[in-house]
Amino acid sequence: MVKGRKGCGASRYARYPAVAALVLVLILGVGGKAPPDARVHPAPLQVAGLIGDRSSSAVPVSPEEALGAAYLPASNVLRLPGGGLRYLPRGSAEAVTVPPDDPGAMAAAAETRGWLEGGTVPGKNAVEHRISERALLDLSLLTRPNGAALAGPYSRWEYVWPRDASFMAVAFAATGHHEESYRILEFLAGAQEPDGAWEARYNADGTPVLDGRSRQLDAVGWFPWAVWYWYVTGGNRTRGRIEALWPAARGAADTAAASLGADGLPPGGADYWEAETWRPNLGTAAPLRTGLRAAADLARRLGHRSDARRYAQAAARLDEAIERSFAPIGYPRTTGARSGADAAVNFLAPPFAPPEPGVRRAIADAAERLRLPNGGVPPGENWPHDPTVAWTPETALFALSASAAGDERSASRWLGWLAAHRTTLGAFPEKVDADGEPESAAPLGWTEAIVLLALAAEDGPLPTPPVPKSSPEDGGRTVLIISGTLLCGGILLAVTRRRSP
């Protein structure tokens, strides 16, 4: 998700690095960076955090307002440098400043603590618990009562991206907040287009933003995965509500399966970079594999056997295509060997798929090739924008895959870097500049969600969509896979018998 160039038309320069560089020079001028004392944050951080009421709305806090302030423990109430408190009363749209013993502020703080206690707060120590608390509260403030999960709290971030929202739903489910998770999934189901896909982003009222931005097909993979995760972790809380979400999950899975071409891969298009690729890209193929596996398992659990078989077969076909087209060249961004390492390689690992040694090696290689001097990573090796700026969602993906793999050393290193580059209010920003300063807006919902999942993975394995297998339930059907090879002017047919998934 590349929010830093929303609405700027910058995607036009995605395939033309030289033009992009020239534009950057023209924008920044030739005078270099402003001196360190020119402003509090050398990077243009717009929002440092939020205060708000989970049941209604939230108010952004600027970096200047955040100076010297800190939240009361496990709350959305700010203690100001002078000792007063600032919070958003229930049902209000404006924050108020009150004395330190104000009953309304105390009640607001108690409400958020009670909400946190209703779920789990991941982490293996007090520091990680505080990070999780803040991330959960920030996600709750970014989620409107109707389930609209906003990407961020400022201007061009105040929209719903289906990918980001799906991750936020999974983070809520992973921490026991299944009601919040359901509301997000219900919103996405209601916003789904008639063809089973989604537009790139949506307004908070569920209407699509039709600004010419290309659709990102990965949504039809992320949504079924999120529904599956909510369902399998919810126990009795989800049993009676799954049928309301199943039609949208089925529509997304149908679209994912139908998108696979003769090569078994989805077509090229806009990935999470929000830039078009001519070749099939990993940022789409991997989520679709995850979503198809999740949909197959969900259909099986719900007794929709024909759907389960279709999605299982599509997932197997896509899996074979990924191994054939991406694995031999190290899982780069696209099927082109020169497309460079990409953070999307993490989508092939737990908790999105079972562990594979080759994928783990590719992740380690990508981390080495992408790591910047400031310690974070950009989306990919051939990222056409500022090469000194790290993006926190992509950095967090490396933390998640390391944590899910049980690689405590790598996970701690990535999580430590992310924690050290939060805003003064503990929110994860979208970007971190070359000087290590937070940039753009915070909190960023996608990063907050991924970090929560990484911390949750430290407490135990996260559910992973199973690779579909044949079972007595489907009658043990056998699929004949016929491949042809040209031999001496004729066709030699090789027939392989395999039990269907």
Stretches with model-predicted labels:
Residues 489-501:
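C-terminal membrane-anchoring or membrane-association module
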